[in-house]
């Protein structure tokens, strides 16, 4: 696996024309912008975990049937400090950078003290977020980095803490029809409490539609949920939204804050301070978007680890939400670089297969309902919600599919009933070998695969004016374990899952994580969404935080990114 994981990737600073085979639809005009780890060693020092690698941005610009590729390392403070020192000097989640051995005892003592409450990295390697007219590389810390989506130049550094009190934040925000951003973060021991903070960033600065105004300055707290534990908050990678509610899972995959505070002096990584508590429950929080308060009923399910929400919607008095769930945290453990050897593809095995699970949460619980009765009256799912003696509700999911990750949908259906999921098929190994189209209605699937090929997260781009949910194309950056085979951008017909075209490039491409598609200038997001009602037209601040036309609870500025992801 040296070709994929063990070798630093080279930048392609100038646009490189790809060799296109097949026919690219004439309407497909824009830039696929992706993010992921590309550098795993600096000098003689090595990162411990694949998710620690320095961020490498890359893009495929599609114009009139031609494709141009470029890539560039994110010029973060972390990157610059490491390169200048020729070693890793900034800690990542799985790699603790140690003090200079030449420092005297007083300098070392000060370093230990300064790391008690760590200033996290700005190595934003996970996703791309659109905020107003700007694009940002994101990670799961309080920092994001503004970038130029065309040149891939790194611009200013933004600290969420200047606007909202969060130490950590997700890389999978949601968007409403106006382009407002909804995201979540964790505020650690703020004013004596640890809480999960939902915050909203307006699409434009209030009172001005002029370009250049920073909407981040006008961020507001949408809702706060106290952590069940002051010193052991839940780790979460994403969340879900419907037209009227927000879905947040407080799962028993936890951060031990005391251990994190002493990690530096103990010489261990922050990742070692994460614990999966298999005896604990997963608590389901449903937040009303209108009142901005959680539904008072206590919902829970069995212990699980969820990285990616797929979608959520309301039906017959219930919130239905779909997630990719694991029985444990083995996925994260497998990607330590020590495990990514030549036998990784054959020998790496998850101890729990990622499953697509559908939960149904009743919005109104009959106090007179019998204990043990199923409160779900939705005919479209076998998921149950059982009333218990203490008025808690135990939710059991319907398992829809086994062996998939990195889910995307047509974001025009985010927060609404939907039918299709586009994902990478992974089964018991974390290696993505196929692209999957899954129909949640018929439970049928279509797949694309090719020998020695590893596909990245598949991104759906709808045909302009499309009426069918799957009328569009799938874009996926494909790398190969065969050094003789060039990497390429794959373009599939989303309906039939047949190949329309591929654009091969003779570059050292990395396996990326998440990203978005930016249509060419002139595209109007509002025109690509269903017509607004009169009530919507009269509201300057719509409460429905769904985003037809945008990304996967993430960010796909296609004419039409699926539900959110990693």
Swiss-Prot record:
Cofactor: Fe(2+)
An annotated GO BP: retinal metabolic process
Residues spanning the membrane: none
Protein's cellular compartments: Cytoplasm, Cytosol
Single GO molecular function: carotenoid dioxygenase activity
Cofactor comment: Binds 1 Fe(2+) ion per subunit.
Main location per the UniProt record: cytoplasm
Function text: Symmetrically cleaves beta-carotene into two molecules of retinal using a dioxygenase mechanism.
Protein name as catalogued: Beta,beta-carotene 15,15'-dioxygenase
Native organism: Rattus norvegicus (Rat)
């Amino acid at each position: 696996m040296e070709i994929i994981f063990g070798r630093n990737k080279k930048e392609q600073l100038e646009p490189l024309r790809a060799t296109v085979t097949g026919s690219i639809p004439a309407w497909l005009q824009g830039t696929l912008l992706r993010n992921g780890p590309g550098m795993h060693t600096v000098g003689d020092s090595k990162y411990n975990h694949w998710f620690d690698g320095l961020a490498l941005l890359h893009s495929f610009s599609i114009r009139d049937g031609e494709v141009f590729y470029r890539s560039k390392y994110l010029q973060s403070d972390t990157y610059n400090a490491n390169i200048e020192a020729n070693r890793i000097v900034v800690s990542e989640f799985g790699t603790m950078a140690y003090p200079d051995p030449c420092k005297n005892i007083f300098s070392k003592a000060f370093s230990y003290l300064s790391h008690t409450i760590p200033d996290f990295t700005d190595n934003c390697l996970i996703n791309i977020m659109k905020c107003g007219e700007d694009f940002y590389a994101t990670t799961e810390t309080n920092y994001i980095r503004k970038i130029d989506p065309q040149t891939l130049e790194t611009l200013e550094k933004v600290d969420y803490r200047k606007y909202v009190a969060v130490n950590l934040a997700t890389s999978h925000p949601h968007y409403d029809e106006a382009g407002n951003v909804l995201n979540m973060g964790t505020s650690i021991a703020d004013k004596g409490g640890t809480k999960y903070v939902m915050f909203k960033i307006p699409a434009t600065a209030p009172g001005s539609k002029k370009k250049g105004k920073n909407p981040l300055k006008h961020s507001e707290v949408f809702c706060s949920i106290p952590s069940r534990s002051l010193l052991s908050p839940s780790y979460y990678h994403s969340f879900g939204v419907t037209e009227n509610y927000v879905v947040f899972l407080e799962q028993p995959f936890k951060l031990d804050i005391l251990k994190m505070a002493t990690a530096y002096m103990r010489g261990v990584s922050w990742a070692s301070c994460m614990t999966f508590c298999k005896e604990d429950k997963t608590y389901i929080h449903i937040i009303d978007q209108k009142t901005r308060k959680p539904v008072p009923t206590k919902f829970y399910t069995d212990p699980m680890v969820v990285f990616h929400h797929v979608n959520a919607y309301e039906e017959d008095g219930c919130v239905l939400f779909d997630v990719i769930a694991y029985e444990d945290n083995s996925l994260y453990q497998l990607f330590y670089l020590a495990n990514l050897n030549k036998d990784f593809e054959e020998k790496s095995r998850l101890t729990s297969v990622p499953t697509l699970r559908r939960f149904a949460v009743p919005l109104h619980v009959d106090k007179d309902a019998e204990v043990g009765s199923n409160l779900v009256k939705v005919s479209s799912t076998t998921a149950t919600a059982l009333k218990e003696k203490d008025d808690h509700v135990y939710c059991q999911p319907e398992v829809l599919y086994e062996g998939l990750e990195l889910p995307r949908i047509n974001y025009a259906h985010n927060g609404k009933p939907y039918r299709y999921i586009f994902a990478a098929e992974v089964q018991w190994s974390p290696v993505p070998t196929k692209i999957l189209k899954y129909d949640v209605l018929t439970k049928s699937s279509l797949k694309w695969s090719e020998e020695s090929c590893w596909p990245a997260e598949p991104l759906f781009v709808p045909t302009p004016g499309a009426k069918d949910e799957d009328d569009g194309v799938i874009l996926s950056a494909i790398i190969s374990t065969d050094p003789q085979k060039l990497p390429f951008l794959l373009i599939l017909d989303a309906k039939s899952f047949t190949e329309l075209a591929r654009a091969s490039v003779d570059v050292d491409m990395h396996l990326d994580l998440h990203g978005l598609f930016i249509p060419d200038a002139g595209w109007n997001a509002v025109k690509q969404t269903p017509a607004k009602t009169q009530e919507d037209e009269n509201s300057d601040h719509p409460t429905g935080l769904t985003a037809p036309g945008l990304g996967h609870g993430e960010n796909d500025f296609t004419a039409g990114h699926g539900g959110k992801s990693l």
